[in-house]
């Protein structure tokens, strides 16, 4: 299986959340893990925000960022090139997606692989991928 992760499916690998176990199983079951280059900055921003909100200590933030760097090496990256950006713009309008979600949607769609499964905890993104024929894994309902 080629496993595509959006940020909501990746952050629980770095910090303990209710979806951490299902995200870990998805990661472990994937022969190849893929995501948009956007995942890196989106994850770093989410972790920093969690620290600002008091959900993570500074030490936990630093440990999570080190783990981000470690796991990032195991991810095959889909570049955010003109093709992905233009498709994401169309999908944002057509499927009523936020910008980052539209980029994840377009990135997974671009892979066009039969054994691709895209993981997220975002129901709107699950619905969007479903409309495009992309198999999904809901990290909130494994």
Task: List the predicted regions and their residue ranges.
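Alpha-helical elements of the RecA-like P-loop NTPase motor core of helicases
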Residues: 21, 86, 126-127
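Alpha-helix capping/helix-boundary segments
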Residues: 9-10, 39, 84, 104, ...
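Acidic, PIN/NYN-like endoribonuclease modules and their adjacent C-terminal/linker elements
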Residues: 2, 105-106, 110-142
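Short, well-structured N-terminal submotif of metal-dependent ribonuclease cores
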Residues: 1-39, 50-63, 142
């Amino acid at each position: 299986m080629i496993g595509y992760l959006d940020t909501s499916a990746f952050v629980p690998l770095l910090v303990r959340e209710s979806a951490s176990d299902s995200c870990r199983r998805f990661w472990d079951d994937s022969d190849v893990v893929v995501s948009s280059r956007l995942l890196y900055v989106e994850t770093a921003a989410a972790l920093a925000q969690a620290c600002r909100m008091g959900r993570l200590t500074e030490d936990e933030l630093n440990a999570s960022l080190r783990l981000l760097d470690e796991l990032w090496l195991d991810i095959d990256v889909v570049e955010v090139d003109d093709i992905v950006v233009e498709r994401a713009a169309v999908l944002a309008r057509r499927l009523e997606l936020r910008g980052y979600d539209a980029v994840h949607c377009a990135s997974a769609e671009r892979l066009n692989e039969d054994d691709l499964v895209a993981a997220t905890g975002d129901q709107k993104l699950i619905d969007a991928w479903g409309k495009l024929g992309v198999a999904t894994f809901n990290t909130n309902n494994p």
